[in-house]
């Protein structure tokens, strides 16, 4: 059984026990988060596609940790004008494990 969920503006294919890195969720470590935006559910070979979400379906995610991603460097430069701007960014994320898919 698997499902496609949407969180943080991105879509993820999830199965029970799978570990995901999603955009930062407003939850503490150890909390269980319920995701109601389930776009697709596959169970015993039968695929149910939502319009846009599957009614009554939800995924339960357990928060494992919070962290920051790899640093990316944004560098702006204008040639011959001595204009240089360097800025770094680390996107916050939440590591979750899928506990259950209810459909």
From Swiss-Prot:
<protein>
    <recommendedName>
        <fullName>Large ribosomal subunit protein bL21</fullName>
    </recommendedName>
</protein>
<comment type="subunit">
    <text>Part of the 50S ribosomal subunit. Contacts protein L20.</text>
</comment>
<keyword id="KW-0687">Ribonucleoprotein</keyword>
<dbReference type="GO" id="GO:0006412">
    <property type="term" value="P:translation"/>
</dbReference>
<dbReference type="InterPro" id="IPR028909">
    <property type="entry name" value="bL21-like"/>
</dbReference>
<dbReference type="InterPro" id="IPR001787">
    <property type="entry name" value="Ribosomal_bL21"/>
</dbReference>
<comment type="similarity">
    <text>Belongs to the bacterial ribosomal protein bL21 family.</text>
</comment>
<dbReference type="GO" id="GO:0019843">
    <property type="term" value="F:rRNA binding"/>
</dbReference>
<keyword id="KW-0694">RNA-binding</keyword>
<keyword id="KW-0699">rRNA-binding</keyword>
<dbReference type="GO" id="GO:0005840">
    <property type="term" value="C:ribosome"/>
</dbReference>
<dbReference type="GO" id="GO:0005737">
    <property type="term" value="C:cytoplasm"/>
</dbReference>
<keyword id="KW-0689">Ribosomal protein</keyword>
<dbReference type="Pfam" id="PF00829">
    <property type="entry name" value="Ribosomal_L21p"/>
</dbReference>
<dbReference type="GO" id="GO:1990904">
    <property type="term" value="C:ribonucleoprotein complex"/>
</dbReference>
<comment type="function">
    <text>This protein binds to 23S rRNA in the presence of protein L20.</text>
</comment>
<dbReference type="GO" id="GO:0003735">
    <property type="term" value="F:structural constituent of ribosome"/>
</dbReference>
<dbReference type="InterPro" id="IPR018258">
    <property type="entry name" value="Ribosomal_bL21_CS"/>
</dbReference>
<dbReference type="InterPro" id="IPR036164">
    <property type="entry name" value="bL21-like_sf"/>
</dbReference>
């Amino acid at each position: 059984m698997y499902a496609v969920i949407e969180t943080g503006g991105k879509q993820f294919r999830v199965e029970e026990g799978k570990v995901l890195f999603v955009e930062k969720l407003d939850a503490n470590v150890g909390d269980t988060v319920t995701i109601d935006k389930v776009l697709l559910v596959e169970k015993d070979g039968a695929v149910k596609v939502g319009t846009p979400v599957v009614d009554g379906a939800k995924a339960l995610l357990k928060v494992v940790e919070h962290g920051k991603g790899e640093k990316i460097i944004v560098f702006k430069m204008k040639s011959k004008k001595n204009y240089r701007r360097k800025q770094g960014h680390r996107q916050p994320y939440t590591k979750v494990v899928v506990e259950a898919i209810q459909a």
